[in-house]
């Protein structure tokens, strides 16, 4: 299996993003987005997926964090798709339940080439929840869905994320990111029993 690495740059009038990703890393992560809680989530994602992940993002956070967070998720998804290459020899499917104190979250991944995202189970109040920003740029939990959708669509994977139960918005969000991380780790890992593309169609 060749090196599974990617470097993607994306610049718009709203943000400038650079993501470097190594799927066969050891969890070395360096993230700077200008949104401290999002940095924390990306650190958790890279660490628990055992990816080497470098993210540098500058955006119009003086307006709010939305553009920077969503655009970073887009570029991460693009890097993930590029690093996967021809997808030969991978497990393809990944699944993880992650507890965090009172919260339990679940994520399932299919590296299918058919982008789709289902995000469900967050308490209704999450659409109004703000995490961090005292001081600094706050993270609005309503963007969680946008993050996971952007990753799925740009990596061309099917991603299902659900909250089974939980109360604290920080714990809920972090459990979701960690569940996605562990599911991705399992899905992209080499399978010693598979040499070709893991599909009856012969392509993903």
From Swiss-Prot:
The protein's enzyme class: lyase
Amino-acid biosynthesis in keyword set: yes
Chief location category: cytoplasm
One function term, GO molecular function aspect: imidazoleglycerol-phosphate dehydratase activity
The enzyme's E.C. designation: 4.2.1.19
GO BP, sorted A to Z: L-histidine biosynthetic process
Superkingdom assignment: Bacteria
Catalyzed reaction equations: D-erythro-1-(imidazol-4-yl)glycerol 3-phosphate = 3-(imidazol-4-yl)-2-oxopropyl phosphate + H2O
Keywords (A to Z) from UniProt: Amino-acid biosynthesis, Cytoplasm, Histidine biosynthesis, Lyase
InterPro entries assigned to the protein according to its UniProt record, in alphabetical order: IGPD_sf (IPR038494), ImidazoleglycerolP_deHydtase (IPR000807), ImidazoleglycerP_deHydtase_CS (IPR020565), Ribosomal_Su5_D2-typ_SF (IPR020568)
One term under GO cellular component: cytoplasm
Pathway: Amino-acid biosynthesis; L-histidine biosynthesis; L-histidine from 5-phospho-alpha-D-ribose 1-diphosphate: step 6/9
Localization of this protein: Cytoplasm
Pfam annotation, one family: IGPD
HAMAP family for this protein: HisB
Record family assignment: Belongs to the imidazoleglycerol-phosphate dehydratase family.
Name used for this protein in its record: Imidazoleglycerol-phosphate dehydratase
Native species: Rhodococcus erythropolis (strain PR4 / NBRC 100887)
């Amino acid at each position: 299996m060749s090196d599974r690495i990617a470097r993607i740059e994306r610049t718009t009038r709203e943000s400038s993003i650079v993501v470097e990703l190594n799927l066969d890393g050891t969890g070395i992560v360096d993230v700077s987005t200008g949104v401290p809680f999002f940095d924390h989530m990306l650190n958790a994602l890279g660490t628990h997926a055992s990816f080497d992940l470098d993210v540098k993002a500058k955006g119009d956070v003086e307006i709010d964090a939305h553009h920077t967070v969503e655009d970073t998720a887009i570029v991460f998804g693009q890097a993930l798709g590029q690093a996967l290459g021809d997808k030969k020899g991978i497990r393809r499917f990944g699944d993880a339940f992650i507890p965090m104190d009172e919260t339990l979250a679940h994520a399932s991944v299919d590296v299918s080439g058919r982008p789709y995202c289902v995000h469900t189970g967050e308490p209704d109040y999450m659409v109004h929840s703000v995490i961090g920003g005292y001081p600094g740029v706050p993270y609005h939990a309503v963007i969680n869905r946008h993050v996971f959708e952007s990753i799925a669509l740009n990596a061309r994977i099917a991603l299902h994320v659900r909250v089974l139960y939980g109360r604290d918005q920080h714990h809920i969000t972090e459990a979701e990111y960690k569940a996605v991380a562990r599911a991705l780790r399992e899905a992209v890992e080499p399978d010693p029993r598979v040499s070709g593309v893991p599909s009856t169609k012969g392509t993903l």
